[in-house]
Swiss-Prot record:
It comes from Acanthamoeba polyphaga mimivirus. This is Uncharacterized protein R865. Belongs to the mimivirus L5 family. Residues 330-368 are annotated as: Disordered. It comes from the Viruses. Residues 336-368 have a biased composition (Acidic residues).
Amino acid sequence: MDTIEPIKICKKMYYSADELKEKCPIFFKGYRNSWSLINADVVDEQCYIFAKYEDGKWIKSTSQSKKFNKVFLLDYWVESNIPEFNSNLEYEITQAPDILKLKNSEKFKDDKGNIIDIEVRGNKNDSECYFLVKDVASGFYIKRLFSILLNFNSGYEIKTHYVYFNIIKQKNDKTIVKKELFLTHLGFVRLIHRSRINNVKYKKTVHRWLSQFKSKTPEKFVLNIEKMSKESRIGFTYLVSSPLLNAVKIGAWRSTLISLRSRYITGYGEDLSLFAIKTADAFALEKKCHKHFTKHKLTNELYDKQHYNEYVIFPKKNKEDYDIELESDIDKSESDIDDSESDIDSENDIDSESDIDDSETDDEEELENPIKTLSSFQYCKNEATDIFGNIKIISDTVDFYLCVSDVEKLIGNKNNYNQDSLIFVKKNYGKELYIKYVGLLEFVFTTNSTKESIVKLRKWMCNTLNTVQMGTKSQKNQLIASMTGVSPEAIKAVFSKTSSTLPCIYFFTIGKVKDLRKSLKISKDYDDEDIIGKYGMTKDLDRRTGEHNDTYGQLPGSDFRLTVFNFIDVQYMSQAETDLKLYMKDTILI
């Protein structure tokens, strides 16, 4: 705030209320002018005066003429009540941080190259950056984002996941203060985790974009928002019932059929009946069903069981075709299922020859790879991870799985887990429920639980990721040492020098496009801030570094340096190089 000097009137010091309104607009929000502040009895009578300007100085006036007089506030009152003058005070809703200006290469783009502008304020720091909610809602087609965030039952918490700021703008030579809602970095991460768009590539792109607020490395962030929007609506409109319930529930589901059955099996029993039909917009078809069968409605989403066959016919006739290429992670193996009850008699029996019988094994997902029980699992041990010592862990060649009965004793109830992450594993004594490791991570980061074990585990995970991504060399060495049991000095020695050759895969950065565009004849399709790199495999990293430095390091504008490398066993060198090439192609980096 620019300094405002008090004025001496009748041996006392006063501040001009008009100047204060201009320099402290948040304090004056809701008051059209300084006179309305007085009329609202905000200022004690002895703490303000009216004054007029005569003969080059301000003189106290006894009249209240708005035409000739101005309002002045006593300096003591101003310095005791206005936050701009008192560091011990702060507004309930503070002024928004400055806008963080992003380069075009740091912004989202749709698949047509159009920029999706999201106002970001603060600094490139995950605890100090904020995203304007109305821009996120518009850019990502989330119409109900405001109501989702502010819904008491949604799990989003003010100051943790979202905040209010006052935005100060100039309009028609007037200063306007407007309250706006912003997502925090953590709130944005939570929003993506809980999104109904089950597209891994989409979520990864958003996560990479958010990661730039911890790192200054520019990347391209291209999203096909229109495609994602259509994809997010593909799903199943379903009917579920059972002998235990004298009603039929009509609903919509965006995930797999296995998880849908798992959702109801506890309440409805093993012999529940499930009919599901895949459509382009599962929730729209669900609404049509609710509207069409209003006369059969019992309560909420439950309907009279006698009309079951009508409920089956209607969605079959009203389903919309969908583009198979738009399917993401929902069940692609079957389009519809029907395991409807055989004891329902009707003149209009359903011909289910095109439907698929939902066999007994559909309520369980089994590990296809050989299972290995990790009885002596060597996890990174500390106060936060000690709970893993009390959890039965198994693995196949793809993933780790944790016994749910052990997990829920320590950190939470299984009803809070993502049902897609739960699997059944056959044992000699029957079936046992396990949760995938990624499912456990999702639970830890999205739960509202304040249980000490969860809070400790989440804090340790965040600190570890921050060190990996943003830590100094010393901090990273300390982290490696804590995981391997080797001293940081030994880690530093191994990575700084060695007397033998180092078979490895590597990645060198050569420089930015803007510095190399001329020497490498790079087209304008690439942004100035894009990074040029060279990857490969070698039996001797020291020799290869020298060779590349003699070529790429001598290019005009080059800033040649080794960015990352990874040791590999000599017998796997060729395979490692092939895997690296495939990875680069899959991630569209070459």
